[in-house]
């Protein structure tokens, strides 16, 4: 029976950070359990190939229940299933979110998670190509830089955005977020730089860190109100128990972590009994508060041939393999913009992802021609969903619903975002290169037609959060401000599921920050990152 001081469940964006930081102490034994396998696929390494991982063994391949406000369709929810987790399959976009996001966390019962508290942890993790500054760090494990070989038409997208009235800003991860600028990316020398690359692989040579892949967790071991270990299966072997002398740390993500809690009898007792799980600890908030960013693309065929069309040709593969440059270094979305679509908003309600590609149906639909996509993303959705068990079998995927577009204001923002996308495409230097609008198409004109198109084509942009809400005071909270599960000892949740409210932007960088700060909380070193930054 394996044992350790800390047993970490999930080698994703948070689990890799925890494994590295906790094993820095040679006297501490750390066991990391990962359901997936190694991250050796070429589709992990090549930035532009990330959609090739969808619906493969590298993907948990979830989908929602029929969504009541999106024509009853099931929405695809990919999640990484290998070392690095979703940081090994995402679009590598480094976006922290806005200071007001974290100050809101603090106001909602999470002291110590305001912007001034979390900024030092962002800086600690970074090795930013821009150099050290008030907002950025160097020397950290996470490589952050600019696009290595941006598409020529990406500059046109940026300049057209400015012509449409969106100011150009130097750094959306700096003092001002509203505006347009190139995306910053998790890459090193033209290849993906995941949490596994940054944190786990450098630590795997340590004798006090053990990593077990192919380990599907069945549930937690409880002794009264204390969690003492984890039950898991590896391959065809029988159930094994990993004992934790100090703590179990759940880092299985916003879908996996609540599923494990529920399978362990931690949640709403009535709902647990319905699927044959014996209740062990009442915590009704488990699985509630699910949030994600809905999006869709305005897509235009263009005359410029410097796009990602036919990027998988041998010559482009050779350029990436030999020089780590060219089309395949693209993250598909190369230009970012945060905008407020109407007066009176406290912050941007739409984030644009813009790139030189036809991106529809999560990249699974193709088009024979050169295209650009201008995709409005709903930054602060008001909809709240949930995750719950399908059955008591750990191998059964959980059920989930996001309730996307339940709030009319969310739909209003996306309609405005689609109109602004068209306005950007109508500005030079882009307008003269646009051949025609493909999506939603020129026949879609008035608000009702745009709303219908949005409901038909809406996607989720791979940012599920919130299902183990952090708060010292909220009634539906699952963990406190130190990420300890309410009412239990020896158990914390450390991943995107603890976010009380989704951040205004991509969620991978915030998840790594959460784990950096959690490592200090666990080690009793809170404030260490602030002291390091001041040194």
Language-model segments: which ranges?
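N-terminal redox-cofactor-binding region of secreted/periplasmic oxidoreductases
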Residues: 1-535
């Amino acid at each position: 029976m394996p044992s350790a001081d800390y047993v970490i469940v999930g080698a994703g964006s948070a689990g890799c950070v925890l494994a590295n930081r906790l094993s820095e102490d040679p006297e501490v034994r750390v066991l990391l359990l990962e359901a997936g396998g190694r991250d050796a696929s070429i589709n992990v390494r090549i930035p532009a190939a990330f959609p090739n991982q969808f619906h493969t063994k590298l993907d948990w391949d979830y989908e929602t229940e029929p969504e009541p406000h999106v024509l009853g369709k099931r929405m695809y929810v990919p999640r990484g299933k290998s070392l690095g987790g979703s940081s090994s399959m995402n679009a590598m976009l480094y976006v922290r979110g806005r200071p007001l996001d974290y100050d809101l966390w603090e106001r909602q019962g999470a002291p110590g998670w305001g912007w001034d508290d979390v900024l030092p942890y962002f800086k600690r993790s970074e090795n930013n190509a821009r150099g050290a500054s008030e907002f950025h760090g160097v020397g950290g494990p996470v490589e952050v830089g600019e696009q290595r070989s941006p598409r020529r038409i990406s500059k046109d997208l940026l300049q057209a955005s400015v012509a449409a009235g969106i100011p150009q800003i130097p750094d959306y991860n700096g003092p001002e977020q509203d505006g347009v600028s190139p995306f910053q990316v998790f890459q090193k020398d033209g290849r993906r730089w995941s949490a596994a690359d940054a944190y786990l692989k450098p630590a795997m040579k340590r004798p006090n860190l053990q990593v077990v892949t192919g380990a599907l967790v069945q549930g937690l071991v409880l002794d009264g109100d204390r969690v003492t270990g984890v039950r898991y299966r590896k391959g065809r072997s029988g159930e094994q128990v990993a004992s934790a002398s100090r703590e179990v740390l759940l880092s299985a993500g916003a879908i996996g972590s609540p599923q494990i809690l529920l399978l362990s009898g931690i949640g709403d007792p009535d709902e647990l009994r319905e699927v044959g799980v014996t209740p062990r600890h009442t915590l009704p908030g488990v699985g509630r508060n699910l949030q994600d960013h809905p999006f869709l693309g305005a897509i235009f065929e263009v005359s410029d041939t410097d796009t990602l069309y036919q990027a998988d040709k041998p010559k482009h593969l050779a350029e990436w393999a030999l020089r780590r440059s060219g089309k395949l270094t693209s993250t598909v979305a190369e230009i970012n913009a945060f905008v407020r679509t109407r007066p009176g908003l406290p912050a941007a309600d739409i984030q644009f992802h813009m790139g030189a590609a036809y991106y529809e149906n999560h990249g699974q639909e193709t088009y024979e021609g050169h295209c650009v996509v201008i995709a409005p993303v709903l930054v602060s959705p008001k909809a709240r969903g949930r995750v719950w068990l399908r059955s008591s079998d750990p191998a059964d995927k959980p059920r989930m619903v996001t309730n996307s577009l339940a709030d009319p204001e969310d739909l209003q923002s996306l309609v405005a975002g689609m109109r602004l996308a068209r306005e950007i495409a109508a500005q030079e230097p882009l307008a003269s290169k646009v051949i025609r609008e493909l999506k939603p198409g020129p026949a879609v004109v008035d608000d009702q037609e745009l709303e219908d198109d949005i409901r038909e084509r809406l996607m989720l942009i791979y940012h599920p959060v919130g299902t183990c809400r952090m708060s010292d005071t909220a009634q539906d909270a699952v963990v406190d401000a130190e990420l300890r599960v309410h009412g239990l000892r020896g158990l914390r949740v450390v991943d995107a599921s603890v976010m009380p409210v989704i951040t205004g932007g991509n969620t991978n960088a915030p998840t790594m920050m959460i784990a950096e700060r959690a490592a200090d909380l666990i080690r009793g070193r809170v404030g260490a990152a602030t002291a390091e930054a001041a040194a």
